[in-house]
Swiss-Prot record:
Residues the record lists as binding Zn(2+) 2: 100, 103, 106, 114
Residues with the Phosphoserine modification: 316
Co-factor binding comment: Binds 2 Zn(2+) ions per subunit.
Organism: Saccharomyces cerevisiae (strain ATCC 204508 / S288c) (Baker's yeast)
Complexes and interactors: Homodimer.
Protein name: NADP-dependent alcohol dehydrogenase 7
Length: 361
């Protein structure tokens, strides 16, 4: 199959002009023996795309292509690829594009925590200085390990958000024993939190949804939550649900705004609070000494290839349907999505589609 020497994408010129992305051509990174090229057909828009675009996490390189929840078809395979990936496969690509594959973390299926050669799918330099370019583009080039086959019964627009948002909440659920007989809380019912409810329920847990007010109650119950707590409006909820939860996953955009003095009261002894929040880079978390007696708190980031495969298997077998709004890939489409994300007007994930009309005519 033919493919272009240069790729095209919708780029952000700088953080001050994030509402006006432009169509640009760019050189892909040099093709490696273990690389694949993927012709993109859909890409989810994650909150981290917005954080980067507006400069919350640091400087934005000129004409940066964002997007890291990618679905597409493999069009080129490196000479030393060994995962079984082949031309024509429909694959998903998440937030990671490279790891060292040699350290203890990589060898124990924790490559997402590799500190030796960790490259994100976008906005991250390779060792040669090339800045990775993401999925708001015609193609993406990356290591085969991070191109994962998608089950046939998961439509591309619904599969895309699983590759970052979905795996980010699934990994702590999986690692902390979410399943039948467990009581699991999800704090923050946004894009990731709504997937947390769906996935925890699909895994067999009793699910508690937590939000600040009552505006998310109806949606949370439709998603499958068994209980709903409006933390700023309901009275006496810490007493009502005392010692209730085995696991609480914090999906809100800010961890520092979580009231741990209240949250710890509803945790079982030995329970776990796991944060997957991705706040602004300067945010600080302050905890009272010994304020979490008998309860552990930790953080989690994305997930391994093995965990993504387990997630896709669960979604396929349980026919989990995340709530997605489709938008056309274009300068206007990306700007529209970011503008609505700024105001919180998303129910509950955006996926960019119509790549064939924009790039593959």
């Amino acid at each position: 199959m033919l493919y272009p020497e240069k790729f095209q994408g919708i780029g952000i010129s700088n953080a001050k002009d994030w509402k006006h992305p432009k169509l640009v051509s760019f050189d892909p990174k040099p093709f490696g023996d273990h690389d694949v090229d993927v012709e993109i057909e859909a890409c989810g828009i994650c909150g981290s795309d917005f954080h980067i675009a507006v400069g919350n996490w640091g400087p934005v390189p000129e004409n940066q292509i964002l997007g890291h929840e990618i679905i597409g078809r493999v069009v080129k395979v490196g000479s030393k690829c060994h995962t079984g990936v082949k031309i024509g496969d429909r694959v998903g690509v998440g937030a990671q594009a490279l790891a060292c594959f040699e350290c203890e973390r990589c060898k124990s299926d924790n490559e997402q925590y590799c500190t030796n050669d960790h490259v994100l799918t976008m906005w991250t330099p390779y060792k040669d200085g090339y800045i990775s370019q993401g999925g708001f583009a015609s193609h993406v080039r990356l290591h085969e390990h991070f191109a994962i086959q998608i089950p046939e019964n998961i439509p591309s627009p619904l599969a895309a958000p699983l590759l970052c948002g979905g795996i980010t909440v699934f990994s702590p659920l999986l690692r902390n024993g979410c399943g039948p007989g467990k009581r699991v809380g999800i704090v923050g019912i946004g894009g990731i939190g709504h997937m947390g409810i769906l996935l925890a329920k699909a895994m067999g847990a009793e699910v508690y949804a937590f939000s600040r007010g009552h505006s998310k109650r109806e949606d949370s119950m439709k998603l499958g939550a068994d209980h709903y707590i409006a933390m700023l409006e309901d009275k006496g909820w810490t007493e009502q649900y005392s010692n209730a939860l085995d696991l609480l996953v914090v999906c809100s955009s800010s961890l520092s705004k979580v009231n741990f003095d209240s949250i710890v009261k509803i945790m079982k002894i030995g329970g776990s609070i796991v944060s997957i929040a991705a706040p602004e880079v300067n945010e600080k978390l302050v905890l009272k000494p010994l304020g979490l007696m008998g309860v552990s708190i930790s953080s989690s980031a994305i997930g391994s290839r093995k965990e993504i495969e387990q997630l896709l298997k669960l979604v396929s077998e349980k026919n989990v349907k995340i709530w997605v709004e489709k938008l056309p890939i274009s300068e206007e489409g990306v700007s529209h999505a970011f503008t609505r994300m700024e105001s919180g007007d998303v129910k509950y994930r955006f996926t960019l589609v119509d790549y064939d009309k924009k790039f593959h005519k």
